[in-house]
Structure formats: C-alpha cells, structure tokens
C-alpha cells in the first residue's frame, strides 16, 4: 500500500470514530486541542500526522490509537 492510501484510510477511521461519538469537527477539535482547519485535511488523508497528534485524537475519542490503523 502506498503512503497516500495509508493516510486516506487512517483519516477515514478517525472520521468514523468521531461520527460514532456524535462529534462535529469543531467539538472534536476542542476535545483534542487541534484547530478545525487542521483536522479537516487529517480526516481527508491529505497530510501526514505526528504520533503525538494521533494519540491526542485517540484520547479525545476514547479509542486505542491502534484502531486508526485497522484496515478492512
């Protein structure tokens, strides 16, 4: 799998978990202290995300960070 595909799938998983929690992008950003303008490209798989950012997002969503890397 190429890098862009990994980023896209990670972003899709983040979006899935955010929606399962019933959070808007704005609410999610508030919970993980990340600007909405930075979250949108992450969820769309357009930018490479740091481990620290992924950990903050997982904590805000109350999921194990490994879940972001589970691809069906």
Where are these regions (language model features)?
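Short, basic-rich loop-to-helix N-cap that marks the start of a DNA-contacting helix
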Residues: 46-56
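Residues within the helices of the helix-turn-helix
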Residues: 15, 26, 55
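Short C-terminal boundary/hinge segments that cap the last helix of small helical domains
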Residues: 62-72
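Residues in the helix-turn-helix
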Residues: 38, 48, 67
